[in-house]
UniProtKB/Swiss-Prot annotation:
The lineage of its organism: Eukaryota, Viridiplantae, Streptophyta, Embryophyta, Tracheophyta. Its main location: nucleus. This is Putative GATA transcription factor 22. It comes from the Eukaryota. One of its GO terms (molecular function) is transcription cis-regulatory region binding.
Length: 352
């Protein structure tokens, strides 16, 4: 009878395919040693009888395990090695039978004495359990409850902020709309009231005009024509007022001007005018020149008269001295001539 062994292996690694060598403890090793002894016995039989077939050496079987699958069941006996997987596995794993020198093996031809079966059950924990053991990161792991709560709190805060901003903006818009509506309503009411007021010109009593002007009764109390007419009248009145003011100031000025003219005509203020000054200066220069000429003539006449008189006087003096006997006795002839010359020199009669 055959013996079955069941082993369970947990896989917690993320590798896709891993080579696994089935050395599963002391008990498994003990059974494998028994199987090796049986295989050696078959080898001796094959050497003695070459027609007999030899069993495969199945001490350690390398096989591949897909860690992505949930459970892997491995069926083991001394003839075949099959992998029984779940229904979602498309292609089952098959192991090769190792045959000795040139022999062919089949399950029908081999008849072992003892049949041993080894059943391996490989289980992999769920992602949820693995992720709960590991530290949770809110960005990479999106399946954890704590991370979901943390992210949801952030999202809630952001949503609250957005909601507050939107509510504030909406309230501001509502207030602006209310203010604009109130202003428009007030403007409409004021315009309606202004339109309803019937204006009458205080001058011509008209009610239709393109433009209302200010008048003596206040703003917009005159029509356009009356306002222009009254404005012209005001300007004319202002011009006449300025003219009368100028006329009230002008008579004394004119009187002063006439008096000045009269004074100039009378000769009192002739010196002030520039033309009489020039004439007077010319006249004075002429008179001065005339007086200078007259004086020169007088001096010349006087000098001639004096010279003639001196000459006459000198001649008379010479005659008198020549005739006097006393003068002749006192002064000799040389001295007489010298005295006459000195007298002549003193009177300027002799010119050298």
């Amino acid at each position: 009878m055959g013996s079955n062994f069941h082993y369970t292996i947990d896989l917690n690694e993320d590798q896709n395919h891993q080579p696994f060598f089935a050395s599963l403890g002391s008990s498994l090793h003990h059974h494998l040693q028994q199987q090796q002894q049986q295989q050696q016995h078959f080898h001796h039989q094959a050497s003695s009888n070459p027609s007999s077939l030899m069993s495969p050496s199945l001490s350690y079987f390398p096989f591949l395990i897909n860690s992505r699958q949930d459970q892997v069941y491995v069926g083991y006996n001394n003839n075949t090695f099959h992998d029984v997987l779940d229904t979602h596995i498309s292609q089952p794993l098959e192991t090769k039978n190792f045959v000795s020198d040139g022999g062919s093996s089949s399950s029908d031809q081999m008849v072992p004495k003892k049949e041993t079966r080894l059943k391996l059950t490989i289980k992999k924990k769920d992602n949820h359990q693995d992720q709960t053991d590991l530290p949770q990161s809110p960005i990479k792991d999106m399946t954890g409850t704590n991370s979901l709560k943390w992210i949801s709190s952030k999202v809630r805060l952001m949503k609250k902020k957005k909601a507050i901003i939107t509510t504030s903006d909406s309230s501001k818009q509502h207030t602006n709309n209310d203010q604009s509506s109130n202003l428009s309503n007030s403007e409409r009411q004021n315009g309606y009231n202004n339109d309803c007021v019937i204006r009458i010109c205080s001058d011509c009593n008209t009610t239709k005009t393109p433009l209302w002007r200010s008048g003596p009764r206040g703003p917009k109390s005159l029509c356009n024509a009356c306002g222009i007419r009254q404005r012209k009248a005001r300007r004319a009145a202002m011009a006449t007022a300025t003219a009368t003011a100028v006329s009230g100031v002008s008579p004394p000025v004119m009187k002063k001007k006439m008096q000045n003219k009269n004074k100039i005509s009378n000769g009192v203020y002739k010196i002030l005018s520039p033309l009489p000054l020039k004439v007077n200066t010319c006249k004075r220069m002429i008179t001065l020149e005339e007086t200078a000429l007259a004086e020169d003539l007088e001096t010349q006449s006087n000098s001639t008269m004096l010279s003639s008189s001196d000459n006459i006087y000198f001649d008379d003096l010479a005659l008198l001295l020549s005739k006097s006997s006393a003068y002749q006795q006192v002064f000799p002839q040389d001295e007489k001539e010298a005295a006459i010359l000195l007298m002549a020199l003193s009177h300027g009669m002799v010119h050298g």
